[in-house]
């Protein structure tokens, strides 16, 4: 036999718990947001500045490559893609050399005289060996790829360092890693392109190195796991029994009549002077003024939020993340570069064939 009793539990406690769970979900929505919430405004600015130091070389060489592409495209001293103009330039070059030999001068003197003439000879010789405007445009594309990879590497490492180390240590590590990337880029540029003429293959190599570094950091940071609890996302005290499903999901019923609970007959002491209504079924007996021995509400469980991050001992390689965030940008840039270099190769082949015809005309076989 059960009794319907009124208790002092109000609906504001359930609303408070629901609001607390919603706040917890919103706060722990992302690993990066959670890690950055521990930083002050000054610390956040220092972390961003140390990260953006690595972006300076790619940004600088993007504008340098675009400026060189503009200058090469605007150079009109000689037009390589007009057969008549190239023929005239080669004819002028060989005529000067033949006149120098006819005057019984040495080859060195003739070459020096030809170079010191109008400057067309040296321009002709360097026209087939210098980079074209399209190569500098492709170089700016690979600078952009290197810029993206540098940012992605340091941004992923930043979350791990903020969680694992102190804020000052994380800032110092970010600054050191940025200097390492900048030093590597400048070292490759100074060794592979000392005269600043061969940017394209250098930045392709830099992007390949940064791709390998991105895979390494993806493996390194794979042991950082974000823990999100189920059913309220809180830990309950083990000394208190769990709440029933009706208590968790019955918020609407609690708003209508939040002072009604069900109790057993043994928990109620019925005084003898209270009037009870006759009931043939012998079921429920309404009590006017019952004295309840255990009328207090059950103790609410203590809530302990779990740690948001945890480090596991096993590291893995996330192939999906690497493919989407790393391989796809590099592959797209490689495809565009392939089309541009095929165009340059075709044009270069036409220039060499034209040079061969000129040499055969000026020096026919015997």
From Swiss-Prot:
Topological domain ranges for the Lumenal compartment: 1-136, 189-195, 343-366
PTM statement from Swiss-Prot or TrEMBL: N-glycosylated.
Transmembrane segments: 137-157, 168-188, 196-216, 322-342
Residue segments, region Disordered: 233-305
Origin superkingdom: Eukaryota
Feature: compositional bias, Low complexity: 272-284
Residue ranges, compositional bias (Acidic residues): 233-256
Name of a matching Pfam family: EOS1
GO biological process terms, semicolon-separated: cellular response to oxidative stress; protein N-linked glycosylation
Cytoplasmic-side positions: 158-167, 217-321
Subcellular locations according to the entry: Endoplasmic reticulum membrane
Positions annotated as glycosylated: 103-104
One GO term describing the cellular component: endoplasmic reticulum
Cited function: Involved in oxidative stress resistance and N-glycosylation.
Similarity section: Belongs to the EOS1 family.
Further information: Present with 937 molecules/cell in log phase SD medium.
Official protein name in the record: N-glycosylation protein EOS1
Protein's organism: Saccharomyces cerevisiae (strain ATCC 204508 / S288c) (Baker's yeast)
Gene name of the encoded protein: EOS1
